[in-house]
Amino acid sequence: QIRKVGKSYRTFYMIEFAGINPETGAPQFYTNDLDENGNYIKEITEKYSEANAIVLDKHAEPNVIGGLSNTLRYKWFDLNFMFSYQFGGYSYDNWAQKTEHGGNDLEANIPTYYRDSWKQPGDITKYELFIESPDVAMNKSTTTRRLHSSDFIRLKTLTFGITLPQVWTQKIGVNNVRVYASANNLWTWAAYDYYDPEAVSGGSAIWGTPPLKTVTFG
């Protein structure tokens, strides 16, 4: 990340990923050299060392953060819910920088999405040839391939309750009885679903514990 006048706080600064070469299965990057007018030249290279990092129009801090809650009541019944959401931010998958090693080392288990890696000429995919070669492995490179939207909508709480009529409860010497069931983090939509957007810290996703789903009764 970088702090620069005119840019959002926690703006990302890194090399641009240019996809996988469909003929060789090797990762590609934009060189992003500057021309005489200060514009980026989008030439493609397979050598990470030939690519230049640039200031992106993507930042860790979301543009919108909010929530929505309400309580609905009908006779004995009540239903309370609360949604939380955020939009406009991005996060970098630091954990993938360890796992996306293409078979080059044994630092971590391989993600399941590597089933869709390049296998033969003509394959169009996001993931490189799976081979023990440091020239192909992506685990030591920081690129936009691992930069993901952190947009999400989450049902944070959902509570359903029943308040028994006093004509029933007073017969046993009790003025008020309410029974309820409550669930937390029951449902989540996320723009990128390989890690929890609320487990991100400072735009970095690594080893974060996601909010747990819980159900309580009372």
Ranges and model annotations:
Residues 1-26, 117-120, 188-218:
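C-terminal beta-signal and terminal closure region of outer-membrane beta-barrel proteins
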Residues 1-60, 100:
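Conserved small-residue
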Residues 4-11, 22-24, 86-178, 183:
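Extracytoplasmic gating/loop element in the C-terminal half of outer-membrane beta-barrel translocons
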Residues 41-51, 129-144, 195-201:
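Flexible, solvent-exposed coil segments and beta strand-coil junctions
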Residues 53-56, 143-147, 202-207:
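Extracellular loop and loop/strand-boundary signature of outer-membrane beta-barrel proteins
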Residues 64, 75-77, 151, 173-177, ...:
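Outer-envelope beta-barrel architecture signal
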Residues 67-69, 157-161, 216-218:
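Membrane-embedded beta-strand positions in outer-membrane beta-barrel channels/transporters
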Residues 76-81, 167-168:
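Repeated loop/turn-to-beta-strand initiation elements of outer-membrane beta-barrel proteins
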